[in-house]
């Protein structure tokens, strides 16, 4: 959906990445000149939500002040939920150097909400060390009504592939459609409604440093994902009581507590720790207009930095519509072996390096130093293409989660019926063209 700046306000969004926002659902609900007055307006409670250390450098410090009907501490004790699908352990299956690809999973046959529909495919690191990521799919056909969720282990980058999501959060509401993403910060409580009845997509659970926009270097002051295109919600609250359930993900396990009111009761807030969404179709793609296919880092949307300069814990990269103008060059992504590990998904269309087998809703994994690249059909076609004319790739959106650590599949992923056992054959048809007598 393309909205003007005026329409953004009417739809309940504020523009900018990690801005210092201020919003209130009732006039005068935000205290003036202080964060924690002796008595907050409307009888609200003041509560700070911290996403970074108190002493983090100001440029990286994230926190928001919430003014809510009841404090977040009001709930019954948590008890652990026994389940085996939404995981943060990645040591149950030895990682394989084999290239792996999965067909799109089927929708559930029984009523399943967003939280119950999450299944972990792979990951590395863990929440205890606050580094690495979990990579999940979600498959849902039922809205969450009297159930709420928060993740204490990491922020969640959610990539819808089929069906819209209405993210009703403590800080406001975000409607997200395929080819948009939404990021829910660590600790923010929310529920998910399904406007289209069912939904499918991908999640990157970031255990490390918060996602940020990459530096642009010699690109200059504009390009890639522009800050103004990130949208955060305006304050919106629920004031209802009942027999509700609060689910938490904590140290790799799910926990449930009873709660007698909706925890989405924030009437006003200010700060820079907030959910946000971004339309991937707004990405300003940079590419070569002379020769060669540049490195895929030019398609970087968000990064989670590590302690090593130039090395990220997670890179979120997209491959959308774009012009290819390189002359006398092989235009698809080239054959590659990478120190990093790559998990890919396809939101819509066809990925330009794979003519067949990689379907929307599917996924692939190419781990550290595992060879990958265009399949035989793509190679032959691109090798014979007329590169004197530009070519536009249209109606596609693929993405990649790239990490420096090996991405370790879970038992579910390794044993899934959707795992394509014949994936390796897409390269077996590559012909030998070498002739030492002909250059």
Swiss-Prot record:
It catalyses: homogentisate + O2 = 4-maleylacetoacetate + H(+). Keywords: Dioxygenase, Iron, Metal-binding, Oxidoreductase, Phenylalanine catabolism, Tyrosine catabolism. Homogentisate binds at residues 351, 372. Fe cation binds at residues 336, 342, 372. It is an enzyme of class 1 (oxidoreductase). One of its GO terms (cellular component) is cytoplasm. InterPro entries: HgmA_C, HgmA_N, Homogentis_dOase, Homogentis_dOase_bac, RmlC-like_jellyroll, RmlC_Cupin_sf. GO terms for molecular function: homogentisate 1,2-dioxygenase activity; iron ion binding. Pathway: Amino-acid degradation; L-phenylalanine degradation; acetoacetate and fumarate from L-phenylalanine: step 4/6. Its EC number is 1.13.11.5. The active site is at 293 (proton acceptor). Its cofactor is Fe cation. GO terms for biological process: L-phenylalanine catabolic process; tyrosine catabolic process. Hexamer; dimer of trimers. Involved in the catabolism of homogentisate (2,5-dihydroxyphenylacetate or 2,5-OH-PhAc), a central intermediate in the degradation of phenylalanine and tyrosine. Catalyzes the oxidative ring cleavage of the aromatic ring of homogentisate to yield maleylacetoacetate. Belongs to the homogentisate dioxygenase family. This is Homogentisate 1,2-dioxygenase.
